[in-house]
């Protein structure tokens, strides 16, 4: 039996990688437009980071993390999300001493042991943006505007933005008491996990995926009725900023997100009942991880889910030709000249491919066509004697005669 990739993982083959490169380049440019710079963090972290950051009672920590002991007996976890590592790097690098805000973006693989289904893998990839040091709701609106702009630029229609406020620790305490009072009436019907959450973190019950629990929380108290004046003012300001930016949204009082570090603003972008991007504010996470008290907000966008959405919407990602010129050859002497010519062209950043297989001219041209080369030329004895060669544009078959030695003239064709 041949070896296969582990369940829930997928190879990115050359025939598909151009789509990822296209999105990554677009995301980098958009992030730069907002003043964000890239951060890269390790693929694994100490488990304590996610226990403290994501939360002990979350599904991520309790059920989904890939955790193991290294040879020194330290508990290590493969990264299940991107925000906590970014915050850890921010604190460890003492970036809080720099002029704020600090704006970061990242591309990262994340690993979660989940049921494998359409658009959900055990290793998937996220594009994320995190902004540290700014507490005004205008930053929340700016962060939300980034995915809005991405979907618009890609031509993705039908995306819904849902927003909510889950308050701060002070007002959430009051809400938790009301929620527990409501849930106590149906305590026996809660799943075993939610019974544990009842005392430790009842808010997590609102995020439970078990059908009986989902049914119970349908009539639960709404958190927006319990948030303090400061959180209420922040949420009203956010809505005003979104209105100014002409960003359509719906208030969904049951969005709580599956990670404990969120406070105040939370949001989700949904298409066809699937969340394709989510985020919010996490004003207490930096301090929890060992830094100073400092506000922060960000989001994570699943790249595989975005690609699946583009496919379902029949939105094609343009594939650029990865070969500018195919250099065919006939005979050993011609092959030597082709090798030298290819080197000169590659030194000038012209993408070239040559025949190493000894194919016939007909087979070489078929290959040039199959790989999508923009141009082709074939050097043989006659071309070497005259110093002239026909340069063929593969798109329409148009040919022009060029001097083999006139590299600058040849370069102009590709610029």
From Swiss-Prot:
Reactions that this protein is recorded to catalyse: tRNA(His) + L-histidine + ATP = L-histidyl-tRNA(His) + AMP + diphosphate + H(+)
UniProt keyword Aminoacyl-tRNA synthetase, yes or no: yes
Keywords: Aminoacyl-tRNA synthetase, ATP-binding, Cytoplasm, Ligase, Nucleotide-binding, Protein biosynthesis
Signal peptide per UniProt: none
MF term (GO), any: transferase activity
One term under GO cellular component: cytoplasm
A GO biological-process term: histidyl-tRNA aminoacylation
Gene3D superfamilies, per database record: Anticodon-binding domain, Bira Bifunctional Protein, Domain 2
Subcellular location: Cytoplasm
Broad class of enzyme this protein falls into: ligase
Chief location category: cytoplasm
EC number: 6.1.1.21
Oligomeric form and interacting partners: Homodimer.
Family per similarity comment: Belongs to the class-II aminoacyl-tRNA synthetase family.
HAMAP family: His_tRNA_synth
Family annotation (PANTHER family): HISTIDINE--TRNA LIGASE, MITOCHONDRIAL-RELATED, HISTIDYL-TRNA SYNTHETASE
Name of the protein: Histidine--tRNA ligase
Organism in which the protein naturally occurs: Clostridium botulinum (strain Hall / ATCC 3502 / NCTC 13319 / Type A)
Gene this protein is translated from: hisS
């Amino acid at each position: 039996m041949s070896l296969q990739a582990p369940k829930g993982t997928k190879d990115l083959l050359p025939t598909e990688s151009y789509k990822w490169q296209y999105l990554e380049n677009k995301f980098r440019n958009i992030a730069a437009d907002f003043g964000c710079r890239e951060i890269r963090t390790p693929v694994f972290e100490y488990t304590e980071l996610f226990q403290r950051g994501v939360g002990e009672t979350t599904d991520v920590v309790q059920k989904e993390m890939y955790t193991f002991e290294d040879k020194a007996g330290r508990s290590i976890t493969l990264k299940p999300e991107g925000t906590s590592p970014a915050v850890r790097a921010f604190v460890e690098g003492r970036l809080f001493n720099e002029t704020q805000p600090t704006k970061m973006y990242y591309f990262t693989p994340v690993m979660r042991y989940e049921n494998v289904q359409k658009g959900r893998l055990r290793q998937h990839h996220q594009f994320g943006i995190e902004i540290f040091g700014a507490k005004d709701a205008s930053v929340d609106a700016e962060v939300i505007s980034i995915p809005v702009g991405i979907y618009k630029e890609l031509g993705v229609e039908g995306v819904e933005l849902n927003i909510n406020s889950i308050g701060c620790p002070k007002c959430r305490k009051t809400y938790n008491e009301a929620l527990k009072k409501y849930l106590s009436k149906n305590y026996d019907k809660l799943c075993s996990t939610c019974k544990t959450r009842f005392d430790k973190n009842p808010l997590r019950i609102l995020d439970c995926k078990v059908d009986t629990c989902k049914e119970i929380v349908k009539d639960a108290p709404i958190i927006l009725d319990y948030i303090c004046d400061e959180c209420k003012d922040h949420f009203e300001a956010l809505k005003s900023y979104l209105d100014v930016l002409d960003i359509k949204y719906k208030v969904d009082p049951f969005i709580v997100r599956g990670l404990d570090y969120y406070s105040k603003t939370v949001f989700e972008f949904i298409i066809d009942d699937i969340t394709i991007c989510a985020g919010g504010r996490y004003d207490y996470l930096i301090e929890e991880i060992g830094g100073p008290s400092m506000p922060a907000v960000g989001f994570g966008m699943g790249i595989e889910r975005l690609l699946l959405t583009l496919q379902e919407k029949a939105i094609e990602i343009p594939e650029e030709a990865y070969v500018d010129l195919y250099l065919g050859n006939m005979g050993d002497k011609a092959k030597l000249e082709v090798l030298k010519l290819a080197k000169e062209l590659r030194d000038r950043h012209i993408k070239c491919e040559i025949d190493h297989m000894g194919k016939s001219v007909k087979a070489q041209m078929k290959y040039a066509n199959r790989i999508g080369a923009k141009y082709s030329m074939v050097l043989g004895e006659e071309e070497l004697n005259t110093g002239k060669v026909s340069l063929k544009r593969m798109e329409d078959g148009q040919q022009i005669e060029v001097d083999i030695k006139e590299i600058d003239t040849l370069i102009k064709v590709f610029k």
